[in-house]
């Protein structure tokens, strides 16, 4: 008789089961909402990753996007050439042919009149082609680690003929290669593997960092981008600071921040294509004087990875590292797939469901 449950007890047990069921459902829903924060120093490739998410997980760029990026392509191309011309003067590099002085003045005048976002006139296009083919300009370009130059300078300047066509329309790759400084916070939403992603890109320059703070709450994972190819370059904002050293310092402050004790950290060692070319001719000892390995992509990139992993002071925190090329859609698709699997496993574990 004592084993029979009273009506109240049965109701209480049913209530308890319902609460447990609801909690589990809430946990599963929480595990489906993923908030990713893209961090990293300026020009590390964060905005390119955001563009890739639009290509891979949304319907790509809209007709309006293509229209809006056209003047950006023109401007990036002209401004890249101007950056080289200004550096020639500072580095004491002369033109291969004295006739290029006239062409250089024409290009400089276009920028002075703020016409660099407009389609190239025939005169401007001819001048730019002659300048880009000049031995002195190429010599100065080969020393681009000594001044500030857009990574995509060669990509655009090698293709002046196509960009100068009257019917020119940007391609997907052109848009991925454009450089516009991110100010404020860019947010992208998409669904992948039955998960709802919110991806936040915040300005990487030092002056922008104070704007990150309110994004930090409830972050599932941080994707930290590093431009591997910048080991021999200095910052825009402070020309005495090595870019790789700045990235390491920033990574240290993010990785060991008390807010991120339980946050997955994914490290994208980006611009691997540029790094692979550069490491053949520019020694890693510029950034890491103690490096005694070979000037070889695999050995040098493994050394850089180890420097970042060594900043992690927590025995319980794992850093998930990937070598990436943000302008390569196939590479980013593959890497993001792997990243998502890690997030799913960690998230389910955190909700007690794995």
From Swiss-Prot:
One of its GO terms (cellular component) is synapse. GO terms for molecular function: G protein activity; G protein-coupled acetylcholine receptor activity; G protein-coupled receptor binding; G-protein beta/gamma-subunit complex binding; GTP binding; GTPase activity; metal ion binding; protein kinase binding. InterPro entries: Gprotein_alpha_I (IPR001408), Gprotein_alpha_su (IPR001019), GproteinA_insert (IPR011025), P-loop_NTPase (IPR027417). It comes from the Eukaryota. SMART domains: G_alpha. Pfam families: G-alpha. A lipid is attached at residue 3 (S-palmitoyl cysteine). Transmembrane segments: none annotated. Residues 35-48 are annotated as: G1 motif. Disruption phenotype: Prolonged exposure to attractive odorant benzaldehyde results in a loss of adaptive response characterized by a decrease in odor seeking behavior and in a loss of egl-4 nuclear translocation. Loss of chemotaxis response to the repellent odor 2-nonanone. Increased egg laying; eggs are prematurely laid at one-cell to 8-cell stage. Increased locomotion. Increases diacylglycerol (DAG) levels along axons. Increases paralysis following treatment with acetylcholinesterase inhibitor aldicarb which is partially reduced in a drn-1 mutant background. G proteins are composed of 3 units; alpha, beta and gamma. The alpha chain contains the guanine nucleotide binding site. Interacts (in GDP-bound form) with gpr-1; gpr-1 forms a complex with gpr-2 and lin-5. Interacts (in GDP-bound form) with gpb-1. Interacts (in GDP-bound form) with gbas-1 (via GBA motif); the interaction leads to activation of goa-1. Guanine nucleotide-binding proteins (G proteins) are involved as modulators or transducers in various transmembrane signaling systems. In the 1-cell embryo, probably together with gpa-16, controls nuclear rotation and spindle elongation during mitosis. During the first embryonic cell divisions, plays a role in gpr-1/2 cortical localization and in the proper orientation of EMS blastomere mitotic spindle. Polarity determinants (par genes) may regulate lin-5/gpr-1/gpr-2/goa-1 locally to create the asymmetric forces that drive spindle movement. It comes from Caenorhabditis elegans. The gene is goa-1. This is Guanine nucleotide-binding protein G(o) subunit alpha.
């Amino acid at each position: 008789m004592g084993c029979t449950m009273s009506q109240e007890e049965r109701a209480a047990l049913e209530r308890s089961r319902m609460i447990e069921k609801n909690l589990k459902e809430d946990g599963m829903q929480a595990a489906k909402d993923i908030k990713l924060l893209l961090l990293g120093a300026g020009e590390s490739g964060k905005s390119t990753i955001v563009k890739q998410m639009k290509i891979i997980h949304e319907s790509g760029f809209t007709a309006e996007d293509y229209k809006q990026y056209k003047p950006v392509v023109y401007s990036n191309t002209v401004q890249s050439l101007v950056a080289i011309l200004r550096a020639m003067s500072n580095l004491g590099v002369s033109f291969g042919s004295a006739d290029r002085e006239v062409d250089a003045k024409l290009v400089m005048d276009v920028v002075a009149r703020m016409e660099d976002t407009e389609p190239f006139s025939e005169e401007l296009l001819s001048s730019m082609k002659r300048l880009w083919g000049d031995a002195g300009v190429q010599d100065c370009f080969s020393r681009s680690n000594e001044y500030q130059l857009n990574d995509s300078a060669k990509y655009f300047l090698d293709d002046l003929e196509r960009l100068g066509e009257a019917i020119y329309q940007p391609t997907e790759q052109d848009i991925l290669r454009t450089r516009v400084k991110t100010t404020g916070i860019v947010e992208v939403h998409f669904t992948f593997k039955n998960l709802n992603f919110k991806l936040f890109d915040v300005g990487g320059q030092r002056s922008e960092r104070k704007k990150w703070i309110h994004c930090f709450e409830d972050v599932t994972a941080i994707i930290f981008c590093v431009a591997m190819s910048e080991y021999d370059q200095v910052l825009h904002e402070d020309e005495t600071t090595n870019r790789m050293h700045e990235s390491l310092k920033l990574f240290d402050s993010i990785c060991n921040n008390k807010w991120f004790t339980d946050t997955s950290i994914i490290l994208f060692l980006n611009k691997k294509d540029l790094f692979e070319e550069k490491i053949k001719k520019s020694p890693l000892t510029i950034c890491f004087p103690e490096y005694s390995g070979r000037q070889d992509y695999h050995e040098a990139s493994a050394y850089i990875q180890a420097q970042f992993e060594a900043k992690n002071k927590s025995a319980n925190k794992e850093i998930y590292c990937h070598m990436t090329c943000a302008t390569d859609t196939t590479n980013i698709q593959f890497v993001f797939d792997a990243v998502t699997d890690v997030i799913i496993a960690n998230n389910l574990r955190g909700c007690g469901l794995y």
